[in-house]
Amino acid sequence: MEHQELFKKHSDFIWDIANLLRGPYRPPQYRRVMIPLTVLRRLDCVLEASKDKVLAEYKLCKMSSKFNDETIESIICRKFDLNFYNTSEFTFKTLLADPNNLARNLVNYLAGFSSKARTILDKFNFGIEIEKLEDANRLFEVIKAVAAIDLHPGRVPNMAMGYIFEDLVRRFNEQANEEAGDHFTPREVIKLMVNLLFNGQEDVYTEGKVIRIYDPTCGTGGMLSESEKHILAENPRAHVELYGQEYNPESFAICGSDLMIKGENTHQIVFGDTLGTGRGKEGVVDGDGHPDETFHYMLANPPFGVEWKPEQDYVTQEHNKLGFNGRFGAGLPRINDGALLFLQHMLSKRVPSEDEGGQPGGGSRIAVVFNGSPLFTGDAGSGESNIRRWIIENDWLEAVVGLPDQLFYNTGISTYIWIVSNRKSDKRKGKVQLINAGDFAWKMKKSLGDKRKKLGEGETENGGFEPNHIDALTRIHGDFQHDQRLRIADIQTNIEPDRKKKRDQEKSVLVSKLFDNRDFGYLKITVERPLRLNFAVTEARIEQVKEGSFFTNLAISKKRKDLVGSAAEIAEGKAQQAEILAILEGLKPRFDAGELVRNRDEFEKLLKAAFKGSEIGWSAPLKKALLAKGALGEQDSEADICLDAKGNPEPDADLRDTENVSLPADIPLPLPLAFENNANKGKVDKSDLLELTRQHCQDYLAREVLPYRADAWIDFDKTKVGYEIPFNRHFYEYEAPRPLAEIEAEIKSLESEIMAMLSEVV
């Protein structure tokens, strides 16, 4: 409670200082100044006691030619037990002593930080803001106000300072929601993710336990900080190590600063593109910033629906060369949404479970928030489907929580939390829990960008009340019940879909369902029907022959550089065209009465006899061109079936259809089917799979297709495996439409209201 009062007091004070920026800055831009200054003031207070001694030691080391800058930094940090230091002559107080040179001195003060601190602080690009404040004649006023805040660690402990900073980051980001939404996850969503991640995990209570947490898209570090707080609240003696990677400079600076001002290690937060581009440069990590590292817990909010074209070549190369020895073995999603690449990346960093050859109690848990696309986008055999298949068949998908819409600052779409783990509890093995949290929403008093709803968090900071949706959803996850229902009154929501009609509080909604892993898999079978054609030689069909590629290509020369040879080839082709047309014209009278030949073999004999002895002859290409559908042949359901050389029916591509058939109820997972990749050139042996599923598919055909299309058959060579999670379909419940009398009465009521309003105008 003492920490909470302290952080509220200081946070409000800093928030009020931001009003000094009004004019040169718009409110959404205040964070550009106030967040870096808060960090600098905390660092200034932390270094105050050792400042003089550090300066003396630094000067002494610089006088020696034996030490380079890296060695000097190591000596000073070790000697004074510091993670960073500052070698400038200035502090916040002494900066104010020279108002005329404040801007220049502040820049020198920033340059005086040791390299590890500068790596973070430089990403704020604060020099631009110093110049802007100086030009607006606000710099002295702002620095004076910030210098008056006492953030000394003796009076503001690290934990309280963490609360202050996180609160400021949240408030400034909410104020700048239009700009910050891409990399700022709402606090209550993070809390729910953390709760679900650690729900039922006994290892977090082990004294002295080393727990490694990772976020590959860590943004401002909210998920890492919330995870650490959750663990330390339950187990103060736990040893938590935080790892992250971020490519937005300001977000990286905020995340690193959060750790720095709490006295924690910052070198495990790296700056760079997690997926990788293959175009690395100094100071930027290109690709995996923590190679060969594994983590116990991982969280992420990858960008929604953002294309990964800049990373395409690098990622595709890794997929093709390394397969499952790299990060992206299961497949690549379509270029317009790379979210599933991040999940594959996280799974590559899992701690092996005991079943995977790891230590007893090993394994990892992942919480990641996606939009709806990763649930179902991608047909059978596509990259997205194969990634889902890989995860589900390995029994790693534990739960999916469908959140309310309008929770995020920069999008109103519905979002979903995936819980993925290679150490499921015994009761969850082979199962996936879907949780419908769509009604667990609390309407906000004031919208923040697209965010109009939030998850209720219980008692609020200002003493108000919200239902505790986070705890309720955590319990639903822990209860692990099938077909669990709750009354609207028990959910406690103030969202009314219909403004004129209150929700029935006694109505129950489905909130939890359990599924077997195989329930999400299906076989995409290709259903063929035979090619049936009638044939005739008529003017219209001859015109179709003339428009065909075989006929037109006869008069096109391939000898482009040999003009003489080209002309001769074209002339020869035109002669062949004329000969074909002449022969067909000779056959026309036979069909003047509308006669049709409904057997292809019979018609072929007729044509073969007509072309016998001609210059062009009866070649295979000519045969194919003339007998094709859309040439002399036309589709006819009454015609005989066209057979191939082996006597098998030929399929009609225009009648081809596909059916998605659920997997057999008793089929073991994983399926005996390799993933298509560069090594097997997309060709995989399906024989074992077909042996297990052939009769199941034939039974489906007999039940669902043959009663309507008796000549249909399955082309098993085209069979593909798909996986999808049709979340909304599983929670859809039919509601009968309102009685017509009720609708009519409402229309009449609205008409009366409109007439009353019009009468007031007139």
Model-assigned labels for residue ranges:
Residues 1-201, 270, 274-277, 402-405, ...:
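Non-catalytic, mostly N-terminal accessory regions of nucleic-acid modification and defense proteins
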Residues 20, 26-42, 329-420, 747:
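Conserved Class I SAM-dependent methyltransferase catalytic core
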Residues 24, 309-318, 323-337, 373-383, ...:
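Short, contiguous acidic/charged loop-to-helix segments that flank catalytic cores in large enzymes
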Residues 143-144, 173, 265-276, 320-326, ...:
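Short acidic (Asp/Glu) and glycine-rich catalytic loops that position anionic groups and cofactors
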Residues 183-300, 304-317, 340, 371-373, ...:
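Conserved S-adenosyl-L-methionine
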Residues 225, 253, 300-302, 340-348, ...:
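Feature representing long, continuous alpha-helical segments
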Residues 409-539:
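Flexible, glycine-/basic-rich loop-and-beta segments that form/coincide
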